[in-house]
Curated annotation (Swiss-Prot):
Bifunctional axonal guidance cue regulated by sulfated proteoglycans; attractive effects result from interactions with heparan sulfate proteoglycans (HSPGs), while the inhibitory effects depend on interactions with chondroitin sulfate proteoglycans (CSPGs). Ligand for receptor PLXNB3. In glioma cells, SEMA5A stimulation of PLXNB3 results in the disassembly of F-actin stress fibers, disruption of focal adhesions and cellular collapse as well as inhibition of cell migration and invasion through ARHGDIA-mediated inactivation of RAC1. One of its GO terms (biological process) is cell adhesion. The keyword Transmembrane helix applies. Keywords: Developmental protein, Differentiation, Disulfide bond, Glycoprotein, Membrane, Neurogenesis, Repeat, Signal, Transmembrane, Transmembrane helix. The gene is SEMA5A. It is found in: Membrane. Its main location: membrane. This is Semaphorin-5A. GO terms for cellular component: extracellular exosome; membrane; plasma membrane. GO terms for molecular function: chemorepellent activity; chondroitin sulfate proteoglycan binding; heparan sulfate proteoglycan binding; semaphorin receptor binding; syndecan binding. It comes from the Eukaryota.
Length: 1074
């Protein structure tokens, strides 16, 4: 008791000491090491997002073959997005019909569950194979990748897609067109299976209701690797005898497996599984048992896996890396086998330690795998555990659960490193660096927050595109694109190097943080990735929210007034580890009551007069301070006045008289000046001018015209037919002037007349043309100019494609003289010539890319073309020399059989024709596959012993006798032979069945409708599985429950255009109510 009191006192003292010394606690806090965290606000400018109205659960992401588009599957929707900016290319709504929803509601499911959740999204060539839960009635479609609305086939999603959106599943599509799916095959999810369908191989599945094959699995991923298809999942450990625990598994099947014959029909004969170990080593290892996600690096044959603790355990996660060789080694080792339910699990030697899916070439089991069918029934679980590359997990973290993983291989300055992106269950992505040589430990480089503060939700999917270094994240309400190289995020050299980011380094020349590809020279590129980055714990202080306004008091001299006050604290956050204190006031005061006070008086204003009695003014205001919020106003006057200049007499008053009238304008038109005057009374010194001027009569003067009289007629030195010409002159002048005397004679006018020499007609101006009269204005010796003849056309400036030529003439025939008129018109003329285009020689364009091979097998060809269009030959130019098409052979390997066997010939029709048919067994025929007709006809072939009725009527007596030669003796002989042959066949079948009566209780069976009663004395010692291991059950139910359209082992492509509702067998009807 005393010791307890001492301990309590110590803890109490320690608490009091911490309260009294907070600086010591802060110092400890600032010395801790944390990884950098990029907030949603910081990463926001780098993100690209896509959202769609009413679309949620963006859980399926894949890329088109050209890696230019992102295909997204959400609830009730399919989307095609641009990889660059996630802009929408196409959106297709894929919703359940009302009848399907009502059927789902009737089975007790909620509205949220009865939707179409996309769970399979696979790209095969130019097609998109996708499946959805379709309100617990799964359905699959085969669409065009370039147009999602174009549906080529629609088939049932049973065994290809889960019924419930809560069930985990995985699927892959091989190059041969086979679909491998791992999912639940029934409505309640009690029949899990790894199932193969489509393609040319028969459908197969794991044994039904056999916990040694699959025991409540959660499927994670699947990969097509070499001869095998690998599946990764977690399940309840059937080999664990003490309680219930979950183990992680790697399973594989051969891709050429066609099932068994008599045993394991429609069932895998090559299915094997092994446990995956991911644990923290120690005297008592700490196991991470539950596999959550995987990522396969085919270049290095490495598989990264995320493992967590059980859901009811402490949260912890780890990343373990497995080599394919280690997985293959486990499958080559011994099996773990339990003889019966009371026996222990013991190792059993592997009959085929180096099994590589070889097949039997001849005999009864031709084309079956080399594995013995009885061994395939018994030996499922491998004894050895698959160990990771390193004994310690590559990365571990407590108090956290990872859900998805993606891996990128990055070339650093000195070495290759692996970058692991881990999605957490609370909506962040952790970026971890793992060295390849394992000489140093892994580092958590940063954690990216995809949601604002205080908002958390799990990540639905994670896909990485190595060619563009981007990460795509599927969330509930949107898709996010995150660039992996964000070197511009680091502004200084210290932050760039200190980030320890393998993608980034400091370029000494450009003086900025760049990626290795952006750097000008590796020698000038600095990078350090030898340590782990630490988070800067310095926190600058920021104020919190203001408190509500509260009443408070203040003292104003001797008076006390009331105010409203509010405060805020520097605690959002408080400054830590050397951070800045908050800037700004921590308290605000408002609405304080205040009494008014007078300001001091202003100075007296100048006197209102310079002489004689005037007055002066001074003022003050009630603003020192202004009364506010109920304060007292000022008492007294705010203005005072007084007289001034009482004794200063003014001198006599001098003033101007009024202005006199305007004097006469100096001009009658065209603008003049006029003046007016005034007189200064009582003195000579009045301010201002005594004369004022202004413009007047600004209107324009009228136009005046003055013409001189004609001069006498005078003869001109021009004669005509014995007569002569005479001329006379006068001058005319026009102007706008106020005085007509200012006009002067200007322009000369000439007038001519003709006088006959005989004096009979006198002189007259009649008959003189205007041109002659005009010419008469000049001297008699005036010579007008005239053009010479045109010269020949000059040579064309171009040989083709439109040139120019010209010709000239000169004004010298005669030249104008003595004031004669010059030549009229141009002296130079231009004309187009050689207007035909120039010939153009053709030139080949660049070769087009090679086309796809015309056939996937059996010998096809691909080709490329070019055209004589760079430029094309024209106007007589030479054509291109050479071939415009090149072809080459491709895919010369022989094709697998794509047609089913021909059916039997039909009965002879009335038209005398028999018909038989065949079907294409490929869902995706390519090239020459399934070429030819699906039906074939021929004329009827009659039996030689059959004679038509028409022939009987016309037959001879000899023919009748020939038909009657088959008598009773022949019938007895045939009957005895048939009886003996039947007995022999019955004996052979009985002997064969006795041979297999001792087969293992691991035979694949389904639940019988009415199982045989068991011995009650040992019922308590036999597990549920042993109830269905009897020989009788094997005889009655030696086949698996396959999909109806696949019971014949082959997929019927002609049924894919229909929509199938799920069909349950009789033995499954009792589960429909769950």
């Amino acid at each position: 008791m005393k010791g307890t009191c001492v301990i309590a006192w110590l803890f109490s003292s320690l608490g009091l000491w911490r309260l009294a010394h907070p600086e010591a606690q802060g110092t400890t806090q600032c010395q801790r090491t944390e990884h950098p965290v990029i907030s949603y606000k910081e990463i926001g400018p780098w993100l690209r997002e896509f959202r769609a109205k009413n679309a949620v659960d963006f859980s399926q992401l894949t890329f088109d073959p050209g890696q230019k588009e992102l295909v997204v599957g959400a609830r009730n929707y399919l989307f095609r997005l641009q990889l660059e900016d996630l802009s929408l290319i196409q959106a297709v709504e894929w919703e359940c019909d009302e009848a399907t929803k009502k059927a789902c509601y009737s089975k007790g499911k909620s509205k949220e569950e009865c939707q179409n959740y996309i769970r399979v999204l696979l790209v095969g060539g130019d097609r998109l194979f996708t499946c959805g839960t379709n309100a617990f009635t799964p359905v699959c479609t085969n669409r065009s990748l370039s147009n999602l609305t174009e549906i080529h086939d629609q088939i049932s999603g049973m065994a290809r897609c889960p019924y419930s959106p809560q069930h985990n599943s995985t699927a892959l599509l091989t190059a041969g067109g086979e679909l491998y799916a791992a999912t639940a095959m029934d409505f309640p999810g009690r029949d899990p299976a790894i199932y193969r369908s489509l393609g040319i191989l028969p459908p197969l599945r794991t044994a039904q209701y056999n916990s040694k094959w699959l025991n409540e699995p959660n499927f994670v991923s699947s990969y097509d690797i070499g001869n095998f298809t690998y599946f990764f999942f977690r399940e309840n450990a059937v080999e664990h005898d003490c309680g219930k625990t979950v183990f992680s598994r790697a399973a594989r099947v051969c891709k050429n497996d066609i099932g068994g014959r008599f045993l394991l029909e429609d069932t895998w004969t090559t299915f094997m599984k092994a446990r995956l170990n991911c644990s923290r080593p120690g005297e008592v290892p700490f196991y991470y048992n539950e596999l959550q996600s995987t990522f396969f690096l085919p270049e290095l044959d490495l598989i990264y896996g995320i493992f967590t603790t059980n859901v009811n355990s402490i949260a912890a996660s780890a990343v373990c890396v497995f080599n394919l060789s280690a997985i293959a080694q486990a499958f080559s080792g011994p099996f773990k086998y339990q003889e019966n339910s009371r026996s222990a699990w013991l190792p059993y030697p592997n009959p085929n330690p180096h099994f590589q899916c070889g097949t039997v070439d001849q005999g009864l089991y031709v084309n079956l795998t080399e594995r013995n069918l009885q061994d395939a029934q018994k030996f499922i679980l491998m004894h050895e555990v698959v160990q990771p590359v390193t004994t310690v997990p590559s990365f571990m973290e407590d108090n956290s659960r990872f859900s998805h993983v993606a891996v990128d291989v990055v070339q650093g300055r000195e070495a290759l490193v692996h970058i692991i992106y881990l999605a957490t269950d609370y909506g962040t992505i952790k970026k971890v660096r793992v060295p390849l040589n394992q000489t140093s430990s892994s580092c958590l480089l940063e954690e990216i927050e995809l949601f604002p503060e205080r908002r958390r939700e799990p990540i639905r999917s994670l896909q990485i595109l190595h060619s563009q270094s981007v990460l795509f994240v599927g969330l509930r309400e949107h898709v996010v694109k995150i660039p992996l190289k964000r070197c511009q995020f680091y502004r200084t050299r210290s932050t760039c190097i200190g980030a320890q980011d393998p993608y980034c380094g400091w370029d000494v020349v450009m003086k900025k943080c760049t990626s290795l590809e952006e750097s000008l020279s590796m020698t000038q590129w600095e990078q350090s990735i030898s340590a782990c980055p630490t988070r800067n714990l310095t926190v600058d202080g920021h104020f919190g929210v203001w408190s509500p306004w509260t009443p408070c008091t203040h003292t104003d001299g001797s008076a006390v007034g009331s105010c409203l006050c509010r405060t805020r604290s520097c605690d959002s956050p408080a400054p830590q580890c050397g951070g800045w204190q908050c800037e700004g006031p921590g308290m605000e005061i408002a609405n304080c009551s205040r009494n008014g006070g007078w300001t001091p008086w202003t100075s007296w204003s100048p006197c209102s007069t310079t002489c004689g009695i005037g007055f002066q003014v001074r003022q003050r205001s009630c603003s020192n301070p202004t009364p506010r919020h109920g304060g007292r106003v000022c008492v007294g006057q705010n203005r005072e006045e007084r007289y001034c200049n009482e004794h200063l007499l003014c001198p006599p008053h001098m003033f101007w008289t009024g202005w006199g009238p305007w004097e006469r304008c100096t001009a009658q038109c065209g603008g003049g000046i006029q003046a007016r005057r005034r007189i200064c009374e009582n003195g000579p010194d009045c301010a201002g001018c005594n004369v004022e001027y202004q413009s007047c009569n600004t209107n324009p003067c009228p136009e005046l015209k003055k013409t001189t009289p004609w001069t006498p007629w005078t003869p001109v030195n021009i004669s005509d037919n014995g007569g002569h010409y005479e001329q006379r002159f006068r001058y005319t002048c026009k102007a706008r002037l106020a005085d007509p005397n200012l006009l002067e004679v200007g322009r000369q006018r000439i007038e001519m007349r003709y006088c006959s020499s005989d004096g009979t007609s006198g002189c007259s101006t009649d008959g003189l043309s205007g041109d002659f009269l005009r010419a008469g204005r000049y001297s008699a010796h005036t010579v007008n100019g005239a053009w010479s003849a045109w010269t020949s056309w000059s040579q064309c400036s171009r040989d083709c494609s439109r040139g120019i030529r010209n010709r000239k003439r000169v004004c010298n025939n005669p030249e104008p003289k003595y004031g004669g008129m010059p030549c009229l018109g141009p002296s130079l003329e231009y004309q187009e010539c050689n207007i035909l285009p120039c010939p153009v020689d053709g030139v080949w364009s660049c070769w087009s890319p090679w086309t796809k091979c015309s056939a996937t097998c059996g010998g096809g060809h691909y080709m490329r073309t070019r055209s004589c269009s760079n430029p094309a030959p024209a106007y007589g130019g030479d054509i291109c020399l050479g071939l415009h098409t090149e072809e080459a052979l491709c895919n010369t390997q022989p094709c697998p059989e794509s047609w089913s066997e021909w059916s039997d010939w039909s009965e002879c029709e009335a038209s005398g024709v028999q018909v038989r048919a065949r079907q294409c067994i490929l869902l995706f025929p390519m090239g020459s596959q399934c070429s030819g007709n699906t039906t074939e006809s021929r004329p009827c072939v009659f039996d030689s012993n059959f004679i038509p009725e028409v022939s009987v009527a016309r037959s001879s007596s000899v023919e009748e006798k020939r038909c009657g030669e088959f008598n009773m003796f022949h019938m007895i002989a045939v009957g005895l032979s048939s009886s003996i042959l039947g007995c022999l066949l019955t004996l052979l079948v009985y002997t064969y069945c006795q041979r297999y009566q001792q087969q293992s209780h691991d035979a694949t069976v389904i639940h019988p409708v009415s199982p045989a009663p068991l011995n009650t004395s040992i019922t308590n010692h036999i597990n549920k599985l042993d109830k269905y291991d009897s020989v009788e059950a094997i005889k009655a139910f030696n086949k698996n429950n396959l999909i109806l359209e696949e019971r014949n082992k082959y997929f019927n492509p002609h049924l894919t255009g229909k929509t199938y509702s799920n069909a349950y067998f009789t033995d499954l009807n009792n589960y429909d109510e769950y």
